[in-house]
């Protein structure tokens, strides 16, 4: 079996953890990546952001061990989510929130280091659900998103370690 990882959630988890470690915690301590130039973001990564990338990789490797799966496929959200066209207020509560500095670097790293999947107009959990529905005995779905539990198959929650 292969492991499908909701890498959007995992990358955000490590990016926000980095921000909290760096300086005080809470959303007020987060430096908005959209407000920084790329050189400044690179400086952050070179100085002490490497532990977040190592932690991200370590988390994926731990999931592979705990689920006894053969390989990880990291799923990310594609561009242009169709839900915004249907419901303009979709995830409106998240608008205006600062974007963690390391998020893009973590995503770039994951796309270079791991097998990844994304599909335009779909979120990561949609990609996972489609893949798992097509081949239910082939995948374990790793996520903390409770909505994904609607998809029949084997599920793994990395926060609780429960399958």
Residue ranges and their predicted role:
Residues 2-142, 153-157, 161-162:
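Noncatalytic, basic helical substrate-engagement surface that gates or grips nucleic-acid strands
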Residues 143-148:
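Short, polar loop motifs at secondary-structure junctions
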């Amino acid at each position: 079996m292969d492991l499908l990882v909701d890498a959007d959630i995992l990358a955000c988890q490590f990016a926000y953890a980095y921000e909290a470690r760096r300086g005080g915690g809470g959303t007020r301590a987060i430096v908005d990546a959209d407000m920084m130039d790329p050189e400044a973001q690179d400086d952050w990564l070179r100085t002490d952001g490497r532990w977040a990338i190592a932690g991200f990789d370590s988390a994926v490797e731990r999931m592979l061990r705990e689920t006894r799966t053969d390989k990880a496929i990291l799923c990310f959200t594609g561009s242009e989510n169709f839900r915004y066209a249907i419901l303009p207020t979709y995830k409106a509560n998240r608008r205006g929130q600062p974007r963690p500095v390391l998020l893009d670097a973590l995503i770039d790293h994951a796309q270079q280091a791991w097998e990844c999947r994304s599909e335009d107009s779909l979120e990561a959990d949609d990609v996972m659900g489609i893949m798992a529905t097509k081949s239910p005995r082939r995948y374990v779905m790793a996520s903390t998103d409770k909505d994904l539990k609607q998809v029949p198959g084997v599920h793994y929650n990395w926060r609780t370690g429960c399958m």
